[in-house]
Amino acid sequence: MTLSPYLQEVAKRRTFAIISHPDAGKTTITEKVLLFGQAIQTAGTVKGRGSSQHAKSDWMEMEKQRGISITTSVMQFPYHDCLVNLLDTPGHEDFSEDTYRTLTAVDCCLMVIDAAKGVEDRTRKLMEVTRLRDTPILTFMNKLDRDIRDPMELLDEVENELKIGCAPITWPIGCGKLFKGVYHLYKDETYLYQTGKGHTIQEVRIVKGLNNPDLDAAVGEDLAQQLRDELELVQGASNEFDKDLFLAGEITPVFFGTALGNFGVDHMLDGLVEWAPAPMPRQTDTRTVEASEEKFSGFVFKIQANMDPKHRDRVAFMRVVSGKYEKGMKLRQVRTGKDVVISDALTFMAGDRSHVEEAYPGDILGLHNHGTIQIGDTFTQGEMMKFTGIPNFAPELFRRIRLKDPLKQKQLLKGLVQLSEEGAVQVFRPISNNDLIVGAVGVLQFDVVVARLKSEYNVEAIYESVNVATARWVESTDAKKFEEFKRKNETQLALDGGDNLTYIAPTMVNLNLTQERYPDVQFRKTREH
């Protein structure tokens, strides 16, 4: 059965994000993936600490000139017969809720782990988010050109800490200075590693068969025998790859390699285009929307503010769920009920910000936004439905915000509410006093808010420390118990930017005790937009 041209386009799409702890090699992997997708000709050489700072500052200069950094957010490139959309999740300096929400717009994730360190804190947090939707995960064990931990130990750690089964696809031969390559468990082939070829795509020498004498000659008898012994163990102790379990988010195929040496990245990409799902259906408040439907629908998962105060435009990122976007089409913004003509949407083909003529499910569009689009907004061709599952996360850092000029309280509140709608920060107004508490997931968010309040709302604000450890959204089906809870805990209650009731806990102990005391009240870590 031949698919219609529309369905052929849908079937070609793969949309994924890379999740990792800072410094596990995400930037390098992104570069190498783009190299394989022919999106760039040679990968930028970021060497060690000294020049990586240098590369970052170059970017910052460029971003200042460009006014808005979009290229790093979404990259589309061809690979084999597929079109791959790679969504960037910001690293440590600018880690924020954006990162979490980006994961709601992808169909699959690549988890990059530094094989010298194993599972780290940020990876755990990001995995919790992918769990909300059982997103399929591929794993890349990186930095095999350094001395790493025992590979079996790494797999055990992923299984125990992240609660996902590991199915090794490739297996390393040596590591550090002795790193010789990887063996592919399902193709019965060994790929030999050459040093110094990290910036371009290299011709890899392949040895067929595990018991081939050429293997002993290539890697040395000791390492060849060690590989055979390890593989016996691995095949006995680890999971076999099963596509259905992968798609259900229960097992992760594991690849070994070095992104810096550009080795093993293509094995992972081959797995990604072969196994990762084409654009998936998405839930709305009324029904499930399939990617095969020809009427357009999409949702906004991120809003990127402009860094240049002269241009107030912000870009809203929309994931296309169904239908084909064509330039100049009329779409309904469901929240406002208004129809808008979208003629200047942006697409992101390999590092260029260009106006798009058409886009399909799985693709990401950039919409110019003058403050009218919010995170979680749904756009359709008229149907009144709202996509669900774009969450707000309970912040982990809190500060009280105070004005230098007390007469500007109104502007401050307006600015904070708008910034919270955009997802830049969360704001809480305690019921029992006039404080304003700002909550964030990353420290950088606080600095951004003060800078933007000054440049966009002409308000000078400063922060003070506040006795808040965490926040939870509260609700209950038992009205009587809920009233009692509200009456007795008034001093700990606040309203967020969308007027949702929140419990502000001074300590985790306080939160745990309160939860025990009021079993009929739900304390939620996430809230839908």
Curated annotation (Swiss-Prot):
Nucleotide-binding listed as a keyword: yes
Main location: cytoplasm
Segments forming domain tr-type G: 11-280
Gene3D superfamilies according to UniProt: P-loop containing nucleotide triphosphate hydrolases, Peptide chain release factor 3, domain III
Subcellular location: Cytoplasm
Origin superkingdom: Bacteria
Binding annotation for GTP: 20-27, 88-92, 142-145
InterPro entries: EF-G-like_DII, EFG_III/V, G_TR_CS, P-loop_NTPase, PrfC, RF3_C, RF3_dom_3_sf, RF3_GTP-bd
Cellular component terms (Gene Ontology): cytosol
Pfam family, one: GTP_EFTU
MF annotations from Gene Ontology: GTP binding; GTPase activity; guanosine tetraphosphate binding; translation release factor activity, codon nonspecific; translation release factor activity, codon specific
Keywords assigned by UniProt, alphabetized: Cytoplasm, GTP-binding, Nucleotide-binding, Protein biosynthesis
Coiled coil: none
GO biological process: regulation of translational termination
Function comment: Increases the formation of ribosomal termination complexes and stimulates activities of RF-1 and RF-2. It binds guanine nucleotides and has strong preference for UGA stop codons. It may interact directly with the ribosome. The stimulation of RF-1 and RF-2 is significantly reduced by GTP and GDP, but not by GMP.
Family designation: Belongs to the TRAFAC class translation factor GTPase superfamily. Classic translation factor GTPase family. PrfC subfamily.
Alphabetical list of HAMAP family matching this protein: Rel_fac_3
Protein's UniProt name: Peptide chain release factor 3
Organism, scientific name: Salmonella arizonae (strain ATCC BAA-731 / CDC346-86 / RSK2980)
Gene that this sequence comes from: prfC
